[in-house]
A protein has these predicted regions:
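Eukaryotic low-complexity, non-globular regulatory regions
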Residues: 147-156
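Long beta-strand-rich cores associated with HINT superfamily self-processing modules
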Residues: 26, 39-148
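Terminal, regulation- and interaction-focused segments at domain boundaries
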Residues: 32-39
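Surface-exposed, low-hydrophobicity interaction/linker segments
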Residues: 1-18
Length: 156
């Protein structure tokens, strides 16, 4: 899990043109709190997303399916924003939580992309993006081959 730090929240609000207030953080940011779920198979990711959408105590806000529609650099993951009930002294309120679901290989790729993106030897951004996309495509092919071994899928 992850909870964004106060200075990071304030910086993001200012960057997007908002005053750094608690109310703006609640209303404008949907990634203050987050969790990442790592699965073996894409089929399990899809089943878990469907389960989360049907969960009666959560509010489905939106999703970004980067597995079906990868980013140009090859990033693949399924992000779901859910409203989670938070009980306060005088009221119950729903706060957005970002849930990232991906496979082990997608998580490995994302970690390597983060590491490579900060290396000075890759000044040629186009070359770096092309290489990352190539590696993402290789991992995707491997995942599809391994899917046949999914004899214990997450069931709804």
């Amino acid at each position: 899990y992850r909870i964004k730090k106060k200075d990071s929240i304030e910086e993001k609000l200012v960057r997007h043109g908002f005053e750094p207030t608690l109310e703006n953080a609640k209303d404008q940011l949907q990634d203050i709190a987050g969790v990442r779920i790592i699965c073996y198979f894409v089929g399990d990711v899809n089943n878990l997303v469907n389960m989360l959408k049907k969960q009666p105590d959560l509010i489905f806000i939106r999703e970004s399916n980067y597995i079906e529609n990868p980013k140009p650099n090859g990033y693949r993951s399924h992000h779901v924003i859910l409203g989670v009930n938070v009980c306060c002294l005088d009221a119950n309120e729903y706060y957005p939580v970002e849930v990232q679901l991906r496979t082990i290989s997608m998580d490995f790729w994302a970690a390597m992309e983060h590491r490579v993106s900060y290396k000075k030897q890759y000044d040629n951004k186009e070359q770096r993006v092309a290489e990352l996309l190539q590696y993402s495509n290789i991992l995707e092919k491997m995942e599809k081959e391994f899917e046949k071994y999914n004899d214990h899928p997450v069931e709804m």
